[in-house]
Regions:
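Structural signature of tandem-repeat unit edges
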Residues: 7-21, 31-44, 54-67, 76-90, ...
């Protein structure tokens, strides 16, 4: 755990191909890190593993990854896109919060647990909205019918001004619209 925590001057890191485990907050607040490839043997990204890597612009996740922990990419302020492998079966809430450059999240069609609709991350069943990319174009968003829950910090920092909620919505997570420009919901 916390192997490289707060190594602010670390700009490059080559993780060994044999690596299988990253500890909680292993690279948290490595503010100078710009790119990273997670080795193929890593199956789980723990909570806050890359949180605060504000200069990270390129990230490659392994095809066999199964779990992305809570806040794993929180405050990765320079990432513009994230591609979630088909093998991922769990994504913790706030995994993609406070990412002001995030334009889109990609999920492969063969992922059985998650999907994206116009770059917005939802469970495959479409009942939970987990993350809305901060810089997604437009000032209005209609939450898809069938969504019953909006995750914690899901719309953090969005430039949306208008959000329409479906009749199906039952729960809005903590601080779901924190630091957004929302005027009408």
């Amino acid at each position: 755990d916390r192997a490289f925590l707060n190594c602010q001057s670390l700009t490059e890191l080559r993780l060994p191909a044999e690596l299988e485990t990253l500890g909680d907050r292993a690279l948290c607040d490595c503010m100078g890190l710009t790119s990273l490839t997670v080795p193929d043997g890593v199956r789980e990204l723990p909570d806050l593993v890359f949180s605060g890597c504000v200069s990270l612009t390129s990230l490659t996740l392994p095809a066999g990854l199964t779990s992305i922990g809570r806040g794993a990419f929180c405050s990765c302020r320079s990432l513009t896109e994230v591609t979630i492998p088909d093998s991922v079966q769990f994504i913790g809430e706030t995994a993609f919060a406070d990412m002001p450059c995030l334009q889109t999240i990609h999920v492969g069609a063969d992922n059985s647990a998650y999907k994206t609709v116009d770059g917005v991350l939802l469970t495959k069943a479409g009942d939970v909205l987990l993350a809305y990319p901060t810089t997604r174009p437009g000032i209005r968003y209609d939450v898809p019918d069938g969504v019953t829950r909006i995750g914690e910090l899901a719309f953090y920092g969005s430039g949306l001004m208008i959000v329409r909620f479906p009749q199906s919505l039952r729960t809005v997570g903590d601080e779901a619209f924190e630091d957004s420009t929302l005027l009408v919901a």
